[in-house]
């Protein structure tokens, strides 16, 4: 659907405006010298929270918000957030059948999550490469048991993360 495609393109464009700022924020977090780093984003508001963790799986840093500075009131942009919040209403207004709306919204949510995850993974890789650092980081929606390993792109769960780092 055209509305969803345009909205996803807006998301990509808006996220890319934050590339250097987010990479700087990642480097600041890496100064905590954790065994690994967790990044979680709020699915509705896209705010990213980050922590340094020790090998026992305990937090060793204060929560850091990424991006640390916003260009507008909302991240990634006020326009995107407004359109994102009103997408369901817009589908109804365009006469989309109710049973199709759920399918559209599910497809949109999956694509949005994929875009955010791949974008953040690239920010992570760029930050590490530019600083000549090796570190482990994991990214997920807030309060999820499953994370994306930012170095490999593969899914890993909380228990596997803790087990991996408690052995090192």
What does each model-identified segment do?
Residues 44, 58, 82, 86-88, ...:
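A generic signature of intrinsically disordered, low-complexity regions enriched in glycine/proline
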Residues 62-66, 76-77, 163-165:
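Glycine-rich loops and low-complexity Gly/Arg-rich segments
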Residues 18, 36, 41-43, 59, ...:
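Sequence-level detector for tyrosine residue identity
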Residues 69-138:
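Amphipathic protein-protein interaction modules
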Residues 2-6, 15, 96, 100, ...:
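Alpha-helical context
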Residues 1-13, 30, 108-168:
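Acidic, proline/glycine-rich low-complexity IDRs
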Residues 27-64:
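Amphipathic, interaction-prone secondary-structure segments
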Residues 14-33:
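Short linear interaction motifs
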């Amino acid at each position: 659907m055209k509305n969803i495609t345009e909205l996803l393109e807006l998301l990509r464009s808006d996220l890319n405006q934050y590339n250097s700022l987010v990479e700087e924020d990642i480097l600041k977090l890496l100064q905590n010298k954790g065994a690994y780093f967790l990044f979680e984003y709020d699915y509705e508001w896209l705010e990213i929270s980050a922590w340094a963790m020790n090998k026992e799986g305990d937090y060793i840093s204060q929560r850091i918000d990424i991006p640390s500075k916003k260009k507008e009131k909302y991240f990634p942009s006020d326009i995107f957030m407004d359109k994102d919040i009103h997408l369901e209403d817009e589908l109804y207004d365009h006469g989309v059948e109710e049973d199709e709306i759920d399918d559209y919204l599910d497809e949109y949510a999956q694509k949005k999550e994929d875009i955010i995850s791949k974008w953040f993974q690239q920010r992570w890789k760029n930050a590490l490469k530019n600083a000549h650092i090796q570190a482990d980081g994991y990214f997920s929606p807030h309060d999820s048991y499953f994370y994306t390993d930012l170095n490999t792109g593969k899914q890993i769960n909380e228990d596997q993360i803790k087990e991996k780092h408690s052995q090192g």
